[in-house]
C-alpha cells in the first residue's frame, strides 16, 4: 500500500444520517484531511430489502450540510469506482471464484430450515451457534445431485482451524480471535449477492484503503475480513474501532431512545447550526490537548490526532450540545439569528408569514433580546411565549415574589409612572423604574423582581425595560392592574 492515507465512510442507504454514523464520517474525514490524504464515500447498498428511496441522497446532503466534503464517491467519481456496491457484482465474482478454485471457499446447499435446526441443537447442548461445516467436503457428484434437486447454493468461506487472528487496533490495542470460535461464514448469498464482510474486504483492498475506522460494533467482523485478505494474498489495512455513544444513563444509544434526538436532519429542522454540531460530535469520543472545547473545522483538521480517540464510551450530553450551539449562536450577526428563528415563529403561528414594516421591527427587537440565551432556532417559540399570550400563569416561585409586602406599593407606583408616558420606549421605562425606586425607597431585588414577575410571569429573563417595551403599554398595564387588584 502507498503512503497516502486513504479512508472511507460507507453508509447504507437505509435512512437518514444518524449521529453515530455522522461521527464515523467526521473522524475519517478529519483523519484524511489532517494527513493530507483522501476521504472516500462508498455506498453499501447490497441489502436491497432495507434500502429506502432517497436514502443515499439524504446521507450525502446531510454530510455536506455538516461541512464534510469528499474526494471520491458516486457523485464526484474517482479512479477506483464504481462507488456503489450494487454496481460491483462482476468484481466480487472474480474474487469469490478465485477462492472457490483455490479450495478456500465452497458451495453450501443447506436450507434455512436445516441451519435453524442445527442452531437449535447447538443451543440445547450449550454451544455457541456456528455452522457445522456439513457441506465443506462435498464431492462434485454430491453437489450435482443437490443441484438437480433444485437447491441453490450459497458460498461459504473455509475458516482455517486452530489459528489465532491478531490485529493491533488503533483505539483498543491488540485484539485476538481464535478461528475455532468462528464457523465457516457465507460470503455470497443464494441469490448471488455478496455478503457485507466479503464485499467490504474486496472494496477496501481495491480502493486502496490504508485505515478502516469504524464503530466497535464491527469488531467481530474484523477477523473475517482479515481471513479474506489473507486468503487472497492482500495487505491488511490498519483497523480502529471507536467506542459506542451512550446516553446519560450510560446505556448504548438505541434508535428507540426518545430522550435524545438522533438524526442530523432533525437537528437542522430544529435550528441547530452545522458548525456547532460538527464541533460537538467531534468531541464525542475524541479529545484535544488542553481545556478548549470550541474549534472551527480548520482548527480541528490542524489538531486532529487519531491516537487521541477515546477507549471509553462517549456520553451524549444534550445540555452540553445546547451550550455549544448557544456559543455559536452568540457569534452570529442579528440578521443570521433572525433567519434562524423567524421560520419557527411563523410555523407556530406567532407572527405573520409576510412580516410588515412595524411587525418586522418588533420581531427584530424581540430576537435581539433573546440572542444571548438562545440554544437553537426553534427554542425561540418557547422563550418568547410570554409575548404572545394574554394571561400569565404564575408558578410557585413567581407567586412567592408577588406575596412580599412591598409589592402592591411598587406595582401601583410603577403603573402610575407608565400611564404618564407619552413615549413607551426602553429608555423611558428604565427612567420610570428609577422613579419608583426614588419614590418608594425599594431597590435591587425588592424593586426589580416584582416588576419582572408581574409583567413577564418569570423570575429570570433578558433586559427588563426592553422586554416591557416589546410587551406594549396596554398589555403591561393590564398585567400590573390584575396583580394590584
Swiss-Prot record:
Residues forming the motif 'KMSKS' region are: 252-256
Record's CDD domains? GluRS_core
Subcellular location per the Swiss-Prot or TrEMBL entry: Cytoplasm
The record, for InterPro entries, names:
aa-tRNA-synth_I_cd-bd (IPR045462), aa-tRNA-synth_I_codon-bd_sub2 (IPR020751), aa-tRNA-synth_I_CS (IPR001412), aa_tRNA-synth_I_cd-bd_sf (IPR008925), Glu-tRNA-ligase_bac/mito (IPR004527), Glu/Gln-tRNA-synth (IPR000924), Glu/Gln-tRNA-synth_Ib_cat-dom (IPR020058), GluQ/Sye (IPR049940)
Transmembrane regions: none
Q: Which PROSITE patterns match?
A: AA_TRNA_LIGASE_I
Instruction: Please state the Enzyme Commission number of this protein.
Output: 6.1.1.17
A single GO CC term, please? Answer: cytosol
Q: Does the keyword DNA damage apply?
A: no
Q: Which GO terms describe its biological process?
A: glutamyl-tRNA aminoacylation
Listed under catalytic activity are: tRNA(Glu) + L-glutamate + ATP = L-glutamyl-tRNA(Glu) + AMP + diphosphate
The family annotation for this protein states:
Belongs to the class-I aminoacyl-tRNA synthetase family. Glutamate--tRNA ligase type 1 subfamily.
Query: Which NCBIfam families does the UniProt record give?
Result: gltX_bact (TIGR00464)
Instruction: Please describe the quaternary structure of this protein.
Output: Monomer.
Q: What does this protein do?
A: Catalyzes the attachment of glutamate to tRNA(Glu) in a two-step reaction: glutamate is first activated by ATP to form Glu-AMP and then transferred to the acceptor end of tRNA(Glu).
Its name, as the record gives it, is Glutamate--tRNA ligase
Amino acid at each position: 500500500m502507498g503512503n497516502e492515507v486513504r479512508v472511507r465512510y460507507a453508509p447504507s442507504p437505509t435512512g437518514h444520517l444518524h449521529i453515530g454514523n455522522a461521527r464515523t464520517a467526521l473522524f475519517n474525514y478529519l483523519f484524511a484531511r489532517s494527513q493530507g490524504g483522501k476521504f472516500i464515500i462508498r455506498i453499501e447498498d447490497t441489502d436491497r430489502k432495507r434500502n429506502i428511496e432517497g436514502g443515499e441522497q439524504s446521507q450525502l446532503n446531510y454530510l455536506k450540510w455538516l461541512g464534510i466534503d469528499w474526494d471520491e464517491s458516486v457523485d464526484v467519481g474517482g479512479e477506483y469506482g464504481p462507488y456503489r456496491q450494487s454496481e460491483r457484482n462482476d468484481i466480487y465474482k472474480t474474487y469469490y471464484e478465485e477462492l472457490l478454485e483455490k479450495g478456500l471457499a465452497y458451495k453450501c446447499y443447506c436450507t434455512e430450515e436445516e441451519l435453524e435446526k442445527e442452531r437449535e441443537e447447538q443451543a440445547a447442548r450449550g454451544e455457541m451457534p456456528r455452522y457445522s461445516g456439513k457441506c465443506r467436503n462435498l464431492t462434485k457428484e454430491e453437489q450435482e445431485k443437490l443441484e438437480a434437486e433444485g437447491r441453490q447454493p450459497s458460498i461459504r468461506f473455509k475458516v482455517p482451524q486452530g489459528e489465532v487472528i491478531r490485529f493491533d487496533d488503533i483505539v483498543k490495542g491488540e485484539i485476538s480471535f481464535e478461528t475455532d470460535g468462528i464457523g465457516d461464514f457465507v460470503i455470497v448469498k443464494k441469490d448471488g449477492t455478496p455478503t457485507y464482510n466479503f464485499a467490504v474486504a474486496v472494496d477496501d483492498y481495491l480502493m486502496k484503503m490504508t485505515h478502516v475506522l469504524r464503530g466497535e460494533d464491527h469488531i467481530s467482523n474484523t477477523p473475517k475480513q482479515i481471513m479474506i485478505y489473507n486468503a487472497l494474498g492482500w495487505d491488511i489495512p490498519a483497523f480502529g474501532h471507536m467506542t459506542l455513544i451512550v446516553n446519560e444513563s450510560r446505556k448504548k444509544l438505541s434508535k428507540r431512545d426518545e430522550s435524545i434526538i438522533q438524526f442530523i436532519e432533525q437537528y437542522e429542522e430544529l435550528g441547530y447550526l452545522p458548525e456547532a454540531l460538527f464541533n460537538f460530535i467531534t468531541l464525542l469520543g475524541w479529545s484535544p490537548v488542553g481545556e478548549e472545547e470550541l474549534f472551527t473545522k480548520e482548527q480541528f483538521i490542524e489538531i486532529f490526532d487519531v491516537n487521541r480517540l477515546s477507549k471509553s464510551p462517549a456520553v451524549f450530553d444534550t445540555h452540553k450540545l445546547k451550550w455549544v450551539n448557544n456559543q455559536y449562536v452568540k457569534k452570529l450577526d442579528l440578521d443570521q439569528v433572525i433567519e434562524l428563528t423567524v421560520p419557527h415563529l411563523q410555523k407556530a403561528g406567532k407572527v405573520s408569514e409576510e412580516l410588515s414594516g412595524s411587525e418586522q421591527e418588533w420581531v427584530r427587537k424581540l430576537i435581539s433580546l433573546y440572542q444571548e440565551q438562545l440554544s437553537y432556532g426553534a427554542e425561540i417559540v418557547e422563550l418568547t411565549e410570554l409575548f404572545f399570550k394574554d394571561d400569565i400563569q404564575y408558578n410557585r416561585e413567581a407567586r412567592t415574589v408577588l406575596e412580599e409586602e412591598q409589592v402592591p406599593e411598587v406595582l401601583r407606583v410603577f403603573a402610575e409612572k407608565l400611564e404618564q408616558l407619552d413615549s413607551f420606549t426602553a429608555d423611558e421605562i428604565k427612567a420610570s423604574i428609577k422613579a419608583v425606586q426614588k419614590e418608594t425607597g425599594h431597590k435591587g431585588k425588592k424593586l426589580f423582581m416584582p416588576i419582572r414577575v408581574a409583567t413577564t410571569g418569570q423570575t429570570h429573563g433578558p433586559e427588563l425595560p426592553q422586554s416591557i417595551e416589546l410587551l406594549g403599554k396596554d398589555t403591561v398595564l393590564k398585567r400590573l392592574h390584575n396583580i394590584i387588584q
